[in-house]
UniProtKB/Swiss-Prot annotation:
Its cofactor is Mg(2+). Mg(2+) 2 binds at residues 216, 219, 254, 256. This is Xylose isomerase. The active site is at 53, 56. Homotetramer. GO terms for cellular component: cytoplasm. It comes from Thermus caldophilus. Binds 2 magnesium ions per subunit.
Length: 387
């Protein structure tokens, strides 16, 4: 019942299960895994696809002939396993040249390098069949505001995004670009901090129809925000192209914990939203095994992410089918049809009628909404003691 299959559209990045456990205070605790080996292992686990940064597959500085050999070998593994590459993304954060930004560096040569690296990653992704290109502006931020740079970065980031969309069109690539917000880390503050800020940016681009969002559970939670609300807004805008799932404690550094290991109720409500919304995109686990783990623990982590998602999916579906839940929701959303015409599209006459209308507010002020009972039922389904 909780066994992952490719049709569940679960994906992992090469950098997730390939994480070697290095952190700011300690060296690697695991060996780097061969991308071909990772692909075969993920396929054995029932995964739909594997995502990658350019440098996850092709180390920086690799000569062209060697690069082509690496790609051929990886494509052969994809053919052998049936694994897809739904998404690629450019690493614009590791190279020391990006220390003060890639797209938003004050140095035009660094910006040009970020442009070129992005185009090369698009070419790589097209070879591998990718349809989504994620843009994560991890270095596009600041610690020192005295530069006044915050007034300039919006044009600087629009230029490459417009360029990349035009390049995709020129090359016949079907990419849609998923922008990934984050409030901070590795920079003290990142300019493109939340789902709302990215949605606002998209509408200033030349080809907004090619752009959407890749929200991440941890990133909105780091800022103390409600991730379910963020995803719902992206869905409402028709801009949820991809999603990063993991676990995160509020107001901490980016922990990238196993999905559902923290904030379990939020994870339950997120799965409920995704599965009831018609979202057809990948369910990508942008997380990694704890530093305490060896390779066996890495695969236990990957299985755990998917199993938890499927358990929460089953629990959410059972919750929505519960007769008492349906009754409570029907009562909650019951509307008096007499009130609805007061909120019809504006006209001068309707505005005057609204100001004259008798509103039965006294009864509304004393009404209870039974949300305590509804929430208790959700908790009981989550705990597995009901349904």
């Amino acid at each position: 019942m909780y066994e992952p299959k490719p049709e569940h559209r679960f994906t992992f990045g090469l950098w997730t299960v390939g994480n070697v456990g290095r952190d700011p205070f300690g060296d690697a605790v695991r060996e780097r895994l061969d991308p071909v080996y990772v692909g075969h292992k993920l396929a054995e686990l029932g995964v739909h696809g594997v995502n990658l940064h350019d440098e996850d597959l092709i180390p920086r500085g690799t000569p062209p002939a060697e690069r082509d050999q690496i790609v051929r070998r990886f494509k052969r593994a994809l053919d052998e396993t049936g694994l897809k590459v739904p998404m690629v993304t450019g690493n614009l954060f590791s190279d020391p040249g990006f220390k003060d930004g890639g797209f938003t560096s004050r140095d035009p040569w660094v910006r040009a390098y970020a442009f070129r690296k992005s185009l090369e990653t698009m070419d790589l992704g097209a070879e591998l069949g990718a349809e989504i290109y994620v843009v994560w502006p991890g270095r596009e931020g600041a610690e020192v505001e005295a530069t006044g740079k915050a007034r300039k970065v919006w044009d600087w980031v629009r230029e490459p995004l417009n360029f990349m969309a035009a390049y995709a069109e020129d090359q016949g690539y079907g990419y849609r670009f998923a922008l990934e917000p984050k409030p901070n880390e590795p920079r003290g503050d990142i300019y493109f901090a939340t789902v709302g800020s990215m949605l606002a940016l998209i509408h200033t681009l030349e080809r907004p129809e090619r752009f959407g969002l890749n929200p991440e559970f941890a990133h909105e939670t780091m800022a103390g925000l409600n991730f379910v609300h963020a995803v719902a807004q992206a869905l409402d805008a028709g801009k949820l192209l991809h999603i990063d799932l993991n676990g995160q404690r509020m107001n901490r550094f980016d922990q990238d914990l196993r999905f559902g290991s923290e904030n379990l109720k939020a994870a339950f409500l997120l799965v409920d939203l995704l599965e009831s919304s018609g979202y057809q995109g990948p369910r990508h686990f942008d997380a990694h095994a704890l530093r305490t783990e060896d390779e066996e623990g890495v695969w236990a982590f990957a299985r755990g992410c998917m199993r938890t998602y499927l358990i929460l999916k089953e629990r959410a579906e059972a919750f929505r089918e519960d007769p008492e839940v349906k009754e409570l929701l029907a009562a909650y959303y019951q509307e008096d049809p007499a009130a609805l015409p007061l909120m019809d599209p504006y006209s001068h006459e309707k505005a005057e009628a609204l100001k004259r209308a008798e509103l039965p507010l006294e009864a509304k002020r004393h009404r209870g909404y039974a949300l305590e009972r509804l929430d208790q039922l959700a908790v009981e389904y989550l705990l597995g003691v009901r349904g």
